[in-house]
C-alpha cells in the first residue's frame, strides 16, 4: 500500500500519531502554543474508533495526576502542555518517576520565564534534562527537528518509557508545533506488547 502523505502542523501530527499507535488516554489542558493537540484529538473523536479517552482537565495539575492514575493501571497515557503548564505538572511528574511508571509528556515550549511568550524557544532544555521536579530522577527526552519527527517520536517515546519504566517527554520548539510540513503518519497499530514489560519492583 502506498504511503499516505499529508500536510499538517506539528501539534496535529502528535495527535494523529497518538491515535494511530493506540494510546489509551490523553489528559490535557489548553495552553498556546500546544492547544492544537487537544483540539485535534477532540475533532477526531478517537473514543468512537479506538476507545481512546480524551479529557480536558480542570487544570494542569489535575491532568498530570490523571496521567499518574492511568499509568498506574497499566494504560498508555499522555499529556501535553507548554512551559508554565509543565512547571505546574512537576510534582506529578516526580511522583510518576518515583513509582517507575511509563507515560508521555509533550512540551511545546514557550520562551522566557513566568508566563513567557509564544515565540519559538528551547528555553526548557535544562529543566527537562535535569528531571524537572524534586528528587534524583531524569526524564527520557526526545527533541524533534521536524514535523515528521513529531509524529515519529510518539511511538518511540512510548517504547522507551515502557522499556525503562520512566516518563518520557517530547521537547518541541514552539515553531515546530505550529509550522506545516508533509508527514507520513505511522501505520495504525496497537502497542499492546508494551504492557508485557516487567512492572515496577516497588508496586
Task: Describe the function of each predicted region.
Residues 42-44, 94-97, 155-160, 185-188:
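Short, solvent-exposed amphipathic alpha-helical segments in soluble enzyme
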Residues 192-199:
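Conserved small/polar residues in nucleotide/adenosyl-binding loops
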Residues 203:
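Cytosolic catalytic cores of cyclic-nucleotide second-messenger enzymes
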Amino acid at each position: 500500500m502506498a504511503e499516505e502523505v499529508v500536510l499538517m502542523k506539528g501539534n496535529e501530527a502528535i495527535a494523529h500519531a497518538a491515535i494511530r499507535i493506540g494510546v489509551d488516554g490523553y489528559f490535557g489542558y489548553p495552553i498556546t502554543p500546544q492547544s492544537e493537540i487537544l483540539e485535534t484529538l477532540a475533532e477526531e473523536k478517537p473514543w468512537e474508533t479506538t476507545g481512546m479517552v480524551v479529557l480536558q482537565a480542570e487544570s494542569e495539575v489535575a491532568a498530570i495526576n490523571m496521567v499518574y492514575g492511568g499509568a498506574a493501571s497499566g494504560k498508555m497515557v499522555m499529556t501535553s502542555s507548554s512551559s508554565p503548564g509543565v512547571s505546574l505538572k512537576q510534582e506529578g511528574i516526580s511522583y510518576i518517576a518515583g513509582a517507575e511508571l511509563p507515560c508521555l509528556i509533550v512540551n511545546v515550549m514557550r520562551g522566557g520565564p513566568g508566563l513567557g511568550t509564544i515565540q519559538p524557544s528551547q528555553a526548557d532544555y535544562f529543566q527537562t534534562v535535569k528531571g524537572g521536579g524534586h528528587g534524583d530522577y531524569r526524564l527520557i527526552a526526545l527533541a524533534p527537528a521536524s514535523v515528521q519527527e513529531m509524529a515519529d517520536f510518539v511511538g518511540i517515546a512510548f517504547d522507551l518509557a515502557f522499556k525503562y519504566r520512566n516518563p518520557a517527554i517530547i521537547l518541541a520548539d514552539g515553531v515546530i508545533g505550529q509550522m506545516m510540513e508533509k508527514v507520513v503518519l505511522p501505520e495504525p497499530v496497537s502497542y499492546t506488547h508494551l504492557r508485557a514489560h516487567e512492572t515496577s519492583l516497588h508496586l
